[in-house]
């Protein structure tokens, strides 16, 4: 995504120089405890995230923030991706968003007719895609304006791949909203977030 600047600029420098879209960063702080989630050498163990993170109160908090702060004005016109921990999480987030009156669709390896879903997203019939690893790399949609980081990760590579989905700068998009969902991690290694990177 950084073109010829990849080896020369940090993400912060690239934003300051206008190579990529600037990130307007928001934090949703939860009381979820990650200190007991195991680490497999690269990232959190997904089975542990399933037990600790995929809880209704956390999901509802994310939906309420989107409903309260991202449905009006410029933010209300933006489409987004919610990065989830697994397929079950994508389905639950999509269900909660639709119940709240925000059009959403789960998007994973289980999705029937994924091309149709993506076309409807590009036609603005769907506002949020709730996705897991399927959309982290190799996908580009320049109009993407909101990234919700609902999957805790210790992998800077994965985090930057996901962030990269929304950093394409266009003639009409100068910035992207990044919403970091920040859980408690105690004395353990801090999960990746925009604040941690910068």
Predicted segments, located by residue:
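Conserved interdomain linker/interface between the two RecA-like ATPase lobes of SF2 helicase motors
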Residues: 4-81
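Conserved SF2 helicase motif VI
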Residues: 154-176
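A conserved SF2-helicase RecA2
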Residues: 11-21, 168-198
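Conserved residues at the C-terminal ends of beta-strands
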Residues: 26, 132, 150
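Conserved helicase ATPase core of P-loop NTP-dependent helicases/translocases
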Residues: 81, 91-136
């Amino acid at each position: 995504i950084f073109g010829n600047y990849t080896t020369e600029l940090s993400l912060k420098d690239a934003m300051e120089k206008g190579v990529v879209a600037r990130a307007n960063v928001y934090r949703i702080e939860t009381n979820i405890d990650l200190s007991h989630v195991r680490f497999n050498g690269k990232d959190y163990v997904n089975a542990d995230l399933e037990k600790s993170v995929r809880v209704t109160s956390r999901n509802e908090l994310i939906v309420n923030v989107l409903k309260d702060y991202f449905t009006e004005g410029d933010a209300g016109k933006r489409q987004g991706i919610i990065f989830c921990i697994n397929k079950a999480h994508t389905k639950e987030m999509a269900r909660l968003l639709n119940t709240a009156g925000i059009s959403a669709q789960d998007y994973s390896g289980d999705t029937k007719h994924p091309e149709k879903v993506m076309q409807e997203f590009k036609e603005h019939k769907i506002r949020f895609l709730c996705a897991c690893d399927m959309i982290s790399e190799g996908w580009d949609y320049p109009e993407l304006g909101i990234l919700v980081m609902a999957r805790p990760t210790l992998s800077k590579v994965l985090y930057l791949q996901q962030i990269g989905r929304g950093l394409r700068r266009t003639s009409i998009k100068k910035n992207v909203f990044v919403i970091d969902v920040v859980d408690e991690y105690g004395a353990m290694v801090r999960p990746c977030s925009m604040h941690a990177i910068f």
